[in-house]
Amino acid sequence: MGNLFKIGQIINTHGIKGEVKVYPLTEDVNKFKRLETVLVGGEEKKILGVKFQKDRVILKIEGIDSMNDAETYKQKYIEIPRENEPELPPDTYYVSDLKECTIYDTNEKEIGRIFDVISTPNNDVYWIKEPKELLIPVLRDIVLDIDIKLKKIIIKPVGEWQDED
């Protein structure tokens, strides 16, 4: 678990006055309104303005005053210190922590590392890309143990809950 929390990624410029378009990495996009400062590419910056556009956040950030300035920040992450985040209830995890975990089955066979967590109406799904793409439904009878400190998740062997090909 890192000390910084990624809450967004700058994906493009917005307009000519240095605003940036951000892809939010948090479910609570209103969090951007509550923040006074953030780290952008490791540099502390003040947030001067926040607007929302569909599924994106438009930010005006201190020191980014033109489209050319904004271009240099494309693909950089917006981060905040972890201590600014609320404590989670039991059996609830931050996606950024899960993405640091490797999944093993009960036979200690390594399945892969979580690439992303997909939210669906019924349950989340762990997306493994390598060594073989696999979607793992996050259900109590499949996901048996999650140890964030050890970055290790234990699941039932794949053949017990899905046909192996």
Swiss-Prot record:
Name of one Pfam family that matches: RimM
Annotated GO MF terms: ribosome binding
GO-annotated biological processes: ribosomal small subunit biogenesis; rRNA processing
Subcellular location as annotated: Cytoplasm
This protein's UniProt keywords: Chaperone, Cytoplasm, Ribosome biogenesis, rRNA processing
Domain annotation PRC barrel: ranges: 90-161
Coiled-coil features, chain-numbered ranges: none
Main subcellular localisation: cytoplasm
Gene3D superfamilies: PRC-barrel domain (2.30.30.240), RimM (2.40.30.60)
Domain of life the protein comes from: Bacteria
Entry-linked InterPro entries: PRC-brl_dom, PRC_barrel-like_sf, RimM, RimM_N, RimM_N_sf, Transl_B-barrel_sf
GO CC terms in record: cytoplasm; ribosome
SUPFAM superfamilies documented for this protein: PRC-barrel domain, Translation proteins
Entry note about domains: The PRC barrel domain binds ribosomal protein uS19.
Purpose: An accessory protein needed during the final step in the assembly of 30S ribosomal subunit, possibly for assembly of the head region. Essential for efficient processing of 16S rRNA. May be needed both before and after RbfA during the maturation of 16S rRNA. It has affinity for free ribosomal 30S subunits but not for 70S ribosomes.
Family: Belongs to the RimM family.
Assembly and interaction partners: Binds ribosomal protein uS19.
Name of the protein: Ribosome maturation factor RimM
